[in-house]
Curated annotation (Swiss-Prot):
Reactions catalysed: Co-precorrin-5B + S-adenosyl-L-methionine = Co-precorrin-6A + S-adenosyl-L-homocysteine
Cross-referenced Pfam families: CbiD
Gene: cbiD
Protein name listed in UniProt: Cobalt-precorrin-5B C(1)-methyltransferase
UniProt similarity note: Belongs to the CbiD family.
Length: 365
């Protein structure tokens, strides 16, 4: 009998960014106008020099130019734009250069603090550069002296944008056209981390020097209740507390409130920068030691070590009058302070599932 072996998981598949899609569709439409060539695929060069071929859904003339579309393939990354139709409309202009327009489903910047000026379409700098380089190369090949007007569209983008951080960042009406390498790495969460950085930038640029970084909706509600902070000062960090703390080295604010569920704050207290269960776990033995430091007797310490969850450990400590929540927040505070610049005042809140505060450490002068 043949011995069975465990099936090896297939490697995760990378995808292409919305910036790559916009580049490919803009190039295809421009080629149709300058060369008359109607293709079902187009090849582009990514920022690091890799060449990729992208399939087109259509490439056709319009009343005053041409348009081409492709389906966004994010590979195995859980990207909100995966499967969306992205299409670019190109019009030739007598003046050299490229003018970008936010079409259907692409947002417009309405707040200062982002890399793009207020009023600009939310097509980020590297996608703009990619599109510009490809169209300039085409213009030189065809000895075309004029310029291009490029309108980028994402079908259903306005609805998809509501699932992103764009409304909070002041990018209204649709999605952002993103990408730095042109490639989407599965589960890299690069776009989410970038939105955290942008949220901090926008808050500071608009004069909000006290921000609250929260792991979810319940912690945001807690911070609204405690401080009445506006939405622009609330940073939805999810599990990526490291993205907040490290960015504050470059863009410091005066005051930082960190708020999250007790379990996630316990991970922060243990020195974890990524609070997702894939990357960090709750150390019940460590919780027992912190409980001991807060006055827990040996029996309670042992019970905490054997607890099923951090919430159960917290409940047992609370019943015994041991302030485990505060102890955990103090350790989380110490770790956060070790990362951010010394001028940033920090405090930490831990909450239960109902949003009640079960621990706090730190404060502001």
């Amino acid at each position: 009998m043949r011995e069975e072996t465990a099936e090896q998981p297939a490697p995760l598949r990378s995808g292409l960014t919305t910036g790559s899609c916009a580049t490919a569709t803009s190039l295809a439409a421009a080629r149709l106008l300058l060369e008359g060539s109607n293709a079902d695929a187009v090849q582009i060069i990514l920022p690091k020099g890799k060449q990729v071929q992208m399939r087109l859904e259509f490439c056709r003339h319009t009343a005053d130019g041409a348009e081409a579309g492709t389906i966004k393939d994010a590979g195995d990354d859980p990207d909100v734009t995966h499967g969306a139709l992205l299409y670019s409309r190109v019009r030739l202009t007598p003046e050299p250069g490229i003018r970008f327009i936010a079409g259907q489903g692409v947002g417009t910047v309405t707040r200062p603090g982002l890399v793009l000026a207020v009023g600009e379409p939310a097509i980020n700098p590297i996608p703009r550069r990619m599109i510009g380089e490809h169209l300039q190369r085409l213009a030189e090949e065809r000895a075309y002296p004029g310029g291009f007007e490029v309108t980028v569209n994402v079908e259903g983008g306005a609805e998809l944008a509501l699932k992103t951080m764009n409304p909070r960042l002041g990018i209204l009406g649709g999605l952002s056209i993103l990408g730095t390498s042109g490639i989407v790495r599965p589960f890299s969460c690069a776009a989410y981390i970038a939105s955290i950085h942008q949220g901090i930038d926008v808050a500071k640029t608009n004069g909000y020097l006290h921000i609250a970084a929260c792991t979810g909706n319940a912690s945001e509600d807690t911070m609204r209740r405690v401080y009445e902070l506006p939405e622009i000062a609330l940073i939805e960090m999810g599990d990526f507390v490291g993205a907040v703390l490290k960015h504050l080295r470059k863009v410091p604010v005066d005051k930082l409130s960190l708020c999250g569920g007790f379990g996630k704050i316990s991970k922060l207290a243990a020195g974890h920068m990524d609070l997702h269960s894939r990357h960090s776990s709750i150390d019940l033995s460590q919780l027992a030691q912190w409980a001991a430091d807060a006055g827990a007797d040996p029996a309670l310490q042992q019970a905490i070590r054997q607890a099923n969850t951090s919430q159960q450990a917290l409940a047992m400590a609370s019943a015994a009058g041991v302030a485990l929540g505060d102890a955990v927040c103090r350790h989380a505070l110490d770790f956060a302070r070790s990362v951010v610049p010394p001028q940033v005042q920090v405090e930490v809140f831990a909450i239960d599932r109902q949003g009640g505060i079960v621990g706090h450490a730190g404060g502001f002068q």
